[in-house]
Design a protein with these regions (language model features):
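Surface-exposed loop/turn elements that mediate protein-protein interactions on large endomembrane-trafficking
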Residues: 1-11, 31-51, 76-103, 125-144
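Repeated scaffold domains used in trafficking and secretory/extracellular systems
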Residues: 2-25, 48-66, 93-118, 144
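Glycine-centered flexibility motif
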Residues: 33, 58, 72-74
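A short, charged
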Residues: 67-78
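Amphipathic alpha-helical binding modules
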Residues: 110-133
C-alpha cells in the first residue's frame, strides 16, 4: 500500500530511521527490521518492501532503476514498478524474489555490488562469494 507523503514528513533524521540507499528517484530506508521505499517524484511511500531478521545490512538500486536489492539475513530483490505491493513473507509473486532467507538455508550477507547491468557480486558474512544474476527479469543466486 502506498501513500502520498512529502519527504519532509518522513522524519528520516529520526534515529529510528536509517537510509540504506538513495538516488534521484528513490529513497530506501529501514526502521527497525522493516525496509521502506519512498518514490520521490510521485511523493509516495511504500510501507514495506522488505523485512529482515536482525535488520537489513544494506541495499542497492540497480543502475537501470529496475530493482532494489536488499540484504542482511538473505536477500530480497524488489522490482521497482507498479503496483508496488507491500512485501509479505512466503509469498511468490512478480514484485519481489527472496534468496537464502529460510531457517535451514540462511545466508548472512555483508555486501552486494553491481558488477554488470545484469549481475551482482554477493559477499557473505564468512567472505564466501556468490553471483546474483538478473536475466530476462529472472533472478538466480549461485556460489562462485
Amino acid at each position: 500500500m502506498s501513500e502520498y507523503i512529502e519527504r519532509e514528513e518522513l522524519r528520516i533524521d529520526d534515529p529510528e530511521y536509517n537510509i540504506l540507499v538513495e538516488n534521484d528517484d528513490y529513497l530506501v530506508y529501514k526502521k527497525y527490521e522493516t525496509v521502506r521505499l519512498y518514490m520521490k517524484k510521485q511523493k509516495q511511500l511504500v510501507w514495506c518492501i522488505g523485512d529482515f531478521y536482525g535488520d537489513a545490512e544494506g541495499a542497492i538500486i540497480t543502475e537501470d532503476n529496475q530493482w532494489c536489492i536488499m540484504y542482511g539475513c538473505g536477500i530480497i530483490a524488489y522490482r521497482l514498478k507498479e503496483p508496488f505491493d507491500d512485501y509479505s513473507y512466503d509469498t511468490v509473486c512478480e514484485q519481489w524474489s527472496e534468496f537464502r532467507r529460510g531457517p535451514k538455508d540462511i545466508l548472512w550477507v555483508e555486501k552486494v555490488v553491481q558488477t554488470s547491468p545484469t549481475s551482482m557480486l554477493v559477499i557473505s558474512e564468512d567472505e564466501s562469494k556468490y553471483t546474483l544474476d538478473i536475466l530476462d527479469n529472472h533472478l538466480k543466486l549461485e556460489r562462485i
